[in-house]
Regions:
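Accessory RNA 3′-end/elbow-binding domains used by RNA modification enzymes
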Residues: 1-23, 29-46, 50, 54, ...
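RNA pseudouridine synthases
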Residues: 2-208, 212-238, 348
């Protein structure tokens, strides 16, 4: 696995979000490293890991926006996935060694196809809604300070506790695709590939969803492809590839004066993520000094944007490797973005202790 090449930025990138369409075969950390080089700054982080095999939307924060990322971690996500029925692997995806070849013969005839579709629809329905999901054992979850995947590689039997997640929808994209896989002795094993669109809460493991679908159908399964298409209000169609971003930086170095890596301004990102609260000069000054406002000030906030980040603000620490949010209890529910009269993003605020208080000040005094 080679690291992506990236041009070195001539000037430091502005604070903001960077939407990258991650290619397969590179880690999320590799993308962060490339962004640091292109943005000429060490202050770059991401809002949730994608496995090396996966492609799609990776949201990076540059400069002060790294602090904003905490409030994106809990956003809902959408994926396009391919699941292979009839074969299991140790990692529950195509990167791991196969562990079982149960096979999934293609249904023949109208009656068999209808029966298969009925069982598939029922299995998908059982996996939709608020469910308890056992995360993949080969994951970055820590057990007594040691990553679960390391324990598995060291030969341990790992049993992770089920966690609550919400699967908003699972849509079948096209008809099931019967195909053939090679068995342990080179024999032909009939399998079926399913293309799915999954809309889910943060913390969902699509690999585990594939595993559980295979178990529900009695044939086993694993994930063969995964692409993240949205995070909260942001879509992969807005993202740039690493090569495109690098070419932009290289070209900008020759401008007079030189220009740097383009980012999505924090104010624009906040308006897309949260209801907007327009502050007076006095209110903005108070917030910049860390003071609260009367709680009824929050009632002036506008309507929540479409696909807004309605998840609670995260105040506990999160894992930098797996990107899953820790639960901050009631803290941060009903977050709004406060803007001064000049349109500058001052802070994210929420109701706390009977006051509207800042949970993140982005434009200090």
């Amino acid at each position: 696995m080679s690291r992506p090449q990236a041009a070195r930025g001539a000037v430091t990138a502005d604070d903001g979000l960077l939407l990258i369409d991650k290619p397969a075969g590179v880690t999320s950390h590799d993308v962060v490293a490339a962004a640091r080089r292109m943005g000429a700054t060490r202050k770059v982080g991401h809002a949730g890991t994608l496995d090396p095999m996966a492609t799609g939307l990776l949201i990076l924060g540059v400069g002060r926006a790294t602090r904003f990322l905490t409030h994106l971690v809990g956003a809902d996500k959408t994926y396009e996935a391919t699941v292979r029925l009839g074969q299991e692997t140790i990692t529950e995806d195509a990167e791991g060694e196969p562990t079982a070849w149960r096979g999934c013969p293609a249904p023949s005839g109208q009656d068999e196809r209808a029966a298969f579709q009925g069982r598939l629809d029922a299995a998908l329905a059982r996996l939709t809604g608020a469910i308890m999901q056992v995360p993949s054992a080969v994951s970055a979850i820590k057990i007594d300070g040691v990553r679960s995947y390391k324990r598995v590689r060291d030969g341990e039997d790992v049993a992770l506790a089920a966690r609550p997640v919400t699967i908003h929808a699972i849509d079948l994209l096209g008809a099931p695709r019967p195909t053939i896989a090679a068995g342990p002795a080179g024999e032909q094993v009939p399998v079926v590939d399913l293309d799915l669109r999954v809309s889910c809460s943060s913390g969902t493991y699509v690999r585990a969803l594939a595993r559980d679908l295979g178990e529900a159908l009695g044939c086993g399964a694993h994930l063969t492809a995964l692409r993240r298409t949205s995070v909260g209000p942001f879509d992969v169609d807005e993202a740039r590839g690493l090569a495109e971003a690098s070419a932009e930086v290289e070209s900008g170095a020759n401008d007079d004066p030189p220009s740097g890596l383009r980012t999505l301004p924090l104010a624009e990102a906040a308006r897309r993520c949260f209801p907007a609260l327009e502050l007076s000069h006095d209110e903005a000054r108070a917030i910049r000094y860390g003071q609260g406002l009367p709680s009824d000030a929050l009632a002036r906030a506008g309507a929540a944007p479409e696909r807004s980040v309605t998840a609670k603000a995260v105040t506990a620490s999160r894992s930098a490797d797996d990107g899953h949010a820790a639960d901050g209890g009631d803290e941060g529910r009903g977050v709004v973005a406060g803007f001064d009269p000049d349109g500058i993003l001052v802070a994210l605020l929420t109701r706390k202790g009977g006051r509207a208080r800042p949970v993140l000040v982005l434009s200090p005094a």
